[in-house]
């Protein structure tokens, strides 16, 4: 699981991971919201889970099985991967996570 609070951290990761352009663009766009929330005094993260094990870690750490996302959608990338983007808000001040989870392809 990768957890980011700044655009610089995210960009460094995306370049090193050779992430698909579609994921980069959406994650960078969402990172702006994370930075705004953090500047306002709340705590927010952008989280990327690339495997089932990382997804399970995020689910356990944030008790995601006990809450529903405010927003969720699937991002298709040109390399054939699917990413599920979900937004979870945990507090009235906007604190929460924007979560990107790699969705395994069906056999």
Can you describe what each PLM-predicted range is?
Residues 2-16, 35, 104:
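Short, extreme N-terminal segment that most often corresponds to the first beta-strand
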Residues 21-105:
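Acidic, low-complexity, intrinsically disordered interaction modules
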